[in-house]
Each structure stands twice: as C-alpha cells, then as structure tokens.
C-alpha cells in the first residue's frame, strides 16, 4: 500500500480515474466536518449528504421528507441561517439525528469531498475513528491511498496534517509505504503531538479562530478524542456517506 497526503483539494493531481490515480481516497477535516460526520453516523444518522454549493443543498434537501432531514452547515465557523445545526460534533446526538438524512455544507470539508467523489472508494477520517479507518484500509489493501486535507479556504491546516500523520502511523506500522514528503512531515507532526492532540488543535490557526468565536471546549475535546469510534463513513453514492463498521 502506497499512501500519499495532499494538504488541500487543489493539491490533488488530475489523475483520478487513471491508472496513476488512487484506489481509495480518505478525506480529513478535523475541525470539524469529518469529526461531525463520524459522530453523526455513529449516533444513527441514515446518511450524510455533502454539498459544496448551498443552492444545490437546498434544492436536493427539498426532495426529502421534512421530518426525516436535517440541514447542517457553517461558513467561517458560524452556523448558517435557516439551518438546523451548525458543524459541531457534540450536537449530533442520537435523539437529534437518529434515522435522519443530514444535508451538510461546510467551509472546507465538503469541498474536499467533492474533489475526490469519483474515486472508487471514498472514506472520511478524524481522530475519533482513526483506528477504524486504518483497519478498513489494512483489510482491503488498496494499492494507492490518497489522503486529502480540507485546510482552511484553500490553505494548509495543522490539525488535518496531524490526523493524516495519526492514520499513517497506524498504516506504516502494518507495512504501508509513505509515498510523498507531505505525509512524511505529517508523521513527524503526529510524533510531536500524539500525547496531547487537543493542544495541537488549539494552537492551530483554525482552532484559534473557533476560540475567538466563542466557547468550543466541548468541540475541541470531542475532535481530539482518539480511537473512540468503530464507524468508517464511506461514500455509497456520489456525495452520500453511510456508516460502515469494522
């Protein structure tokens, strides 16, 4: 297994669907989209449908019964007007999301998902489901895995690289090969912060941005919780993620 990491969607090569392209893609948005997706599916959401475009989200959501849908979204870390929830993993509790389709759009994570949606296998990872995703990849043994960070508005993010390093650490320990310098750097970052990942999230520029917006202590704690979930959010149709458990 050859594993590469790309900091943001714009860095992903135009090789998807070609013989040089990935056999599996893993999207990362630690603060907070892929953490929220993992917890929502763990807590019984029917699926999470991701949109980069808000107009498309609103249009598609109208085709779903109102009592079985929720709109989740943020821009700049703030909940969108008219939406049911923002992008907090601690808000997607079972009594809120059980059995519902979540229509989701965020500043960064949903763009990264759209970039790789044509890869044959698409998953999402965050720190809480790091080991579950590693186990799935090690079981299936795709030849080429591309991890894709979401970043912040097209720029590098510390926390996504931390999670890339965390996932790579588990894969490399089982024989996977590091295929680019970006992943090698992410491994070094994980080695530095693995004993206190929450501290890394808080010093990251997006972590500081969330702190300025208000008290997000519960979100930081949730997003930093390592290996707590057995769910692997997996694309089952374009843009739609469902729970696969390992």
From Swiss-Prot:
Designated name of the protein: Probable 2-phosphosulfolactate phosphatase
Family listed: Belongs to the ComB family.
EC number: 3.1.3.71
Keyword Kinase assigned: no
Catalyzed chemical reaction(s): (2R)-O-phospho-3-sulfolactate + H2O = (2R)-3-sulfolactate + phosphate
Keywords: Hydrolase, Magnesium
Broadest EC class assigned to this enzyme: hydrolase
GO MF, one annotated term: sulfopyruvate decarboxylase activity
Cited InterPro entries: ComB-like, ComB-like_sf
Source species: Synechococcus sp. (strain WH7803)
Cofactor or coenzyme needed: Mg(2+)
Keyword Hydrolase among UniProt keywords: yes
């Amino acid at each position: 297994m050859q594993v590469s990491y790309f900091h943001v969607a714009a860095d992903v090569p135009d090789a998807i669907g070609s013989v040089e392209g990935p056999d599996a893609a893993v999207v990362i948005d630690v603060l907070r989209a892929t953490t929220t997706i993992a917890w929502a599916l763990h807590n019984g959401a029917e699926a999470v449908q991701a949109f980069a475009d808000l107009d498309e989200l609103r249009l598609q959501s109208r085709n779903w019964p109102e009592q079985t849908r929720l709109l989740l979204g943020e821009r700049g870390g703030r909940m969108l007007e008219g939406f049911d929830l923002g992008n907090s993993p601690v808000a997607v509790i079972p009594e809120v999301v059980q059995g519902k389709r979540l229509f989701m759009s965020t500043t960064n994570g949903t763009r990264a998902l759209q970039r790789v949606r044509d890869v044959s296998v698409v998953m999402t990872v965050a720190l809480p489901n790091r080991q579950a995703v590693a186990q799935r990849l090690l079981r299936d043994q795709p030849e080429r895995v591309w991890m894709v960070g979401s970043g912040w508005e097209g720029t590098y993010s510390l926390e996504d690289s931390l999670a890339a390093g965390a996932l790579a650490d588990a894969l490399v320990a089982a024989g996977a090969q590091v295929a680019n310098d970006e992943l090698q750097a992410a491994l070094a970052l994980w080695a530095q912060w693995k004993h206190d990942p929450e501290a890394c999230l808080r010093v990251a520029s997006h972590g500081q941005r969330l702190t300025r917006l208000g008290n997000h202590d519960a979100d930081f704690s949730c997003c930093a919780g390592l290996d707590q979930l057995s769910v692997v959010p997996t694309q089952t149709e374009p843009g739609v993620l469902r729970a696969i458990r390992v």
